[in-house]
């Protein structure tokens, strides 16, 4: 899909998304590819891309009065004719062009995953000292902000301190490092608190998530990429939640766990794992939006 399409051309192909440059806008297409441990898996997960796109749309709509976002439309009829094909319906998003900021904004409301491993070792998560005596999967007294660098495909993101995020941003935007670092930190915490409270009311714990921000044509900080999807977040069922153990999830943690248990898989998943992953994504979508998932 790298041919010219009217006034559109393939700009970027990531682990999961393809981004097309269409004059003054972008079209982001979420494929059914799935990645874990910074590798693209050999299987595709049916309808996954459309679920991610529709879930991002839900959250962009829900938070648009709090922080502006890049979404223009998810209706392919608003996009160039090339995208008026069945394969693009439901999984494509017309977006404003942003100058993306080179920091991934991670917020953690519960201690789990790599954060739990770090805490057990030295009582910190990404250099942030936490209270003693926390249990695995326990809710933190306050959400913590743990930014990281953006790695190229095949490389690993690197956790950085807030101070380091200022340096990274200052290098690209002289005189603006502190301002942008503060704005994206504050926006990340605000968005997380609002959305985590909503999700909890629907039976889902958002343990942690990742946001990406950019600057619009007016230099305003705007949220881009995806928002609060099972790819960018840890979603746990509220029912049965108990600190002190790992939690079942509605996200790709299920895939990560299978890969860890099967190190010789060569990143090829069996059909039942694929089916279970689709079920989990659809269940999360229904709980959060109140609607059965439909691509069209």
UniProtKB/Swiss-Prot annotation:
Entry-linked PROSITE patterns: SAICAR_SYNTHETASE_1 (PS01057), SAICAR_SYNTHETASE_2 (PS01058)
Claim: S-adenosyl-L-methionine is one of the keywords in the record: no
Protein keywords: ATP-binding, Ligase, Nucleotide-binding, Purine biosynthesis
Transmembrane segments annotated in the record for this chain: none
GO molecular function annotations of the record: ATP binding; phosphoribosylaminoimidazolesuccinocarboxamide synthase activity
Pathway in which this enzyme or protein is active: Purine metabolism; IMP biosynthesis via de novo pathway; 5-amino-1-(5-phospho-D-ribosyl)imidazole-4-carboxamide from 5-amino-1-(5-phospho-D-ribosyl)imidazole-4-carboxylate: step 1/2
Keyword Nucleotide-binding annotated: yes
Signal sequence region: none
Catalytic activity: 5-amino-1-(5-phospho-D-ribosyl)imidazole-4-carboxylate + L-aspartate + ATP = (2S)-2-[5-amino-1-(5-phospho-beta-D-ribosyl)imidazole-4-carboxamido]succinate + ADP + phosphate + 2 H(+)
GO terms under biological process: 'de novo' IMP biosynthetic process
EC numbers for this chain: 6.3.2.6
One term under GO cellular component: cytoplasm
Protein origin, superkingdom: Bacteria
Family the UniProt entry places it in: Belongs to the SAICAR synthetase family.
Protein name: Phosphoribosylaminoimidazole-succinocarboxamide synthase
Gene name tied to this protein: purC
């Amino acid at each position: 899909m790298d041919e010219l399409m009217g006034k559109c051309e393939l700009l970027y192909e990531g682990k999961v998304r393809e981004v097309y440059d269409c004059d003054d806008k972008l079209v982001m297409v979420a494929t059914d590819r799935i990645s874990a441990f910074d590798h693209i898996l050999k299987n595709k997960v049916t309808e996954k891309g459309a679920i991610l796109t529709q879930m991002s749309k839900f959250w962009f709509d829900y938070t648009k009065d709090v922080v502006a976002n890049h979404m223009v439309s998810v209706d392919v009829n608003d996009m160039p004719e090339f995208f008026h094909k069945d394969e693009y319906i439901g999984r494509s998003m017309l977006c404003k062009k942003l100058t993306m900021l080179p920091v991934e904004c991670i917020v953690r409301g519960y201690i789990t995953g790599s954060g739990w491993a770090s805490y057990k070792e030295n009582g910190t998560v990404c250099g942030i000292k936490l209270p003693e005596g926390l249990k695995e999967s326990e809710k933190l007294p306050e959400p913590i902000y743990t930014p990281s660098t953006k790695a190229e495909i095949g490389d690993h993101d690197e956790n950085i301190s807030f101070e380091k995020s200022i340096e990274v941003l200052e290098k690209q935007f002289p005189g603006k490092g502190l301002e942008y670092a503060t704005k994206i930190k504050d926006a990340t915490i605000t968005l997380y608190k609002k959305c985590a409270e909503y999700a909890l009311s629907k039976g889902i714990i958002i343990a942690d998530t990742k946001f990406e921000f950019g600057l619009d044509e007016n230099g305003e900080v705007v949220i881009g990429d995806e928002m609060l999807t099972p790819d960018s977040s840890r979603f746990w069922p509220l029912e049965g939640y108990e600190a002190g153990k790992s939690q079942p999830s509605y996200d790709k943690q299920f895939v990560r766990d299978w890969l860890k248990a099967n190190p010789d898989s060569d990143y090829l998943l069996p059909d039942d794992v694929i089916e279970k992953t689709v079920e989990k994504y659809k269940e999360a979508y229904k709980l959060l939006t109140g609607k059965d998932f439909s691509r069209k």
